[in-house]
Amino acid sequence: MKKILSLILAVMMLAVVPAFAVDADLSFGTQETGTAGYTYATAIQTVIQKVDGINVTLLTNSAGNVSAPVLIQEEEADLTMSNSAPAMWAANGGIESASVPECPDIRCIAGGLGHDFVNVMFTQKFVDETGIKTVEELVEKKYPIKLVIKKNGTLGELAAEKVFGVLGVTFDDIISWGGVVEKTGGAQIKDGLQDDLYQMTVDHIGAGQANTTDLCINHAMYDVQLSDDTLAKLCEEGFDYVTVEPNTWNGQTEEIKTVGSQQCVLVSANLDEEVAYQITKAMCENKDVLAEASAALGYFDPTVAGSKALTGCELHPGAARYYEEMGYAFK
């Protein structure tokens, strides 16, 4: 009888063990303390660790979202954050201008973490003097524009490269027209435009970005609307449509239709499928916790987080399984 009771007890104990029991000690590669990236990573770490058996340690070994896929490819972190467009470029040949090699082993857990966008501006003085109001017209006329953008390897610099690239123009072409392409820091960009040393800038930023906010308050700027055809071509390059609401910047009275590349969480293709499933589930079922940590994370929408436009690279099978079970969009 004792043997029978012991057997029954053992079976009952096995029955209450969750089918999804996991045991994983993961590292999350992020940027240094005090950055927005670190804030996002901390919030995601918090919700992932709600899963029994998963522990996440933050490593401040990421140089930024453009090069972040390398951390996964070279097994320097189990998770990291990138943006959908750089993730796509890294997975499909690498990013030469940012010295990012091809990263075929990266997979996405979830995308759409943010509301950043490609921001194109002329100085109002430039528009008044030339009558040029669009990038397409500038390119058609081969105008020797004085362009100032972020440094090599930043998403701002790559966004500028793509805006001109889909119009068939390189930075070398602009220089050959007699123009200038200056790559520098954010504060220097703001000061240079305010002093009318430059006439145009392109960046990838979010509403409220300090330098652009200050620039538009202290200097008359013109918000440039890209054509529908240009926007469609940029979407083919890994971006997705974003609307910039009126009054995002001082003097901007109308909405601007543009594109952006939102942040995404990357893991290795070799990550255990059940672990990836549980990470995805934890993020999606705790989206309110993420939103409380950062306004940018409030844009996270689980119903589309697995869609191609937001993931950049291939979804991890564990993540795809969760989205499919929930009836959410996934590729």
Where are these predicted regions, by residue range?
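Sec-dependent N-terminal signal peptides of Gram-positive bacterial secreted proteins and lipoproteins
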Residues: 4-21
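Bilobed "Venus flytrap"/periplasmic-binding protein-like clamshell domains
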Residues: 25-51, 56-59, 116-195, 308-318
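Pocket-lining segment of extracytoplasmic ligand-binding domains
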Residues: 84-86, 94-96, 102-104, 108-110, ...
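N-terminal segment of the mature folded domain
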Residues: 64-117
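Ligand-binding clefts/hinges and TM-proximal coupling segments of bilobed small-molecule sensing domains
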Residues: 131-159, 240-308
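Solvent-exposed loop/turn segments at secondary-structure junctions
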Residues: 33-36, 64, 85-89, 116, ...
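An extracytoplasmic/periplasmic, membrane-proximal ligand-sensing/linker region
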Residues: 40, 205-208, 214-217, 223, ...
